Amino acid sequence: MSEKDKLTQSIFEMYQEYPFPDINYKMDYSLPLIRFLNDNAEKGKKNLLDGANVLEAGCGTGNTIIKLAETCPTGNFTGVDMTVNSLKIAKKNSDIKNLKNLNFQEQNILNLDLGKKFNIIFCIGVLHHLADMQKGMQSLVSHLEDDGYLIMWLYGKDGRFKLNLNQRMLSVLFQNENSLKKKVELTKKILRNESNKYLDCHFNVPESKIEDKWEEAVSYTH
């Protein structure tokens, strides 16, 4: 197994143990996304989702795709993820809302095979975790209609500079600790006793979300 494959596997195992995001996770990109969907709608349609086939690749626990399906009942929505435990939560939350226009499938983006194309594909904070980022992109594009929209969000080297420093600091502190569960417990303890002065850039998040900050992603700079 290559180093990139090992990193991707470790991320998969982490999300299996700590499904993300939790139900109360705040989506900072919501307003810009809604504005884009509304501004680019065809004449006579409420937004781009109206009557569209929509895919979220790497949907996790389904927060984004559930909210979109709930907002636009005329669209047909599909969420895929390789993390079974996250999908269980997504399906449960979708069933609670009785969403008939949304389905979930266990799929790996690198081997994506849905047998159809989509008008809109969302891939939010996922592609950079893959062992082969280019193959992942090609897989998404192959499922996109010729006039479709691919909406992505990726890590950036400069934008995550302080967060990366936080990760490195904790990696040094916990270099002799192999248990992810123990690392999370120690991190929570640090967060309870230190201020934002030392732990900055979205690292001082509620404890329910701290697990996501342990991801050692496959890093690319563009």
PLM regions: where:
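A short acidic, Gly/Pro-enriched loop at the edge of an enzyme's catalytic core
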Residues: N111-I120
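Conserved SAM-binding strand-loop segment of SAM-dependent methyltransferases
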Residues: N98-L110
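Conserved class I S-adenosyl-L-methionine
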Residues: Y149-K197
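Conserved SAM-binding loop of SAM-dependent methyltransferases across substrates and taxa
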Residues: T61-P73
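Conserved small/polar residues in nucleotide/adenosyl-binding loops
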Residues: T221-H222
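Conserved SAM/SAH-binding beta-strand->alpha-helix loop
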Residues: T83
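A short glycine-rich, Lys/Arg-flanked "PGG" loop and its adjoining helix->strand segment in the class I
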Residues: Q134-D146
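Conserved alpha-helix/loop element of class I SAM-dependent methyltransferases that forms part
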Residues: E17, M27-G51
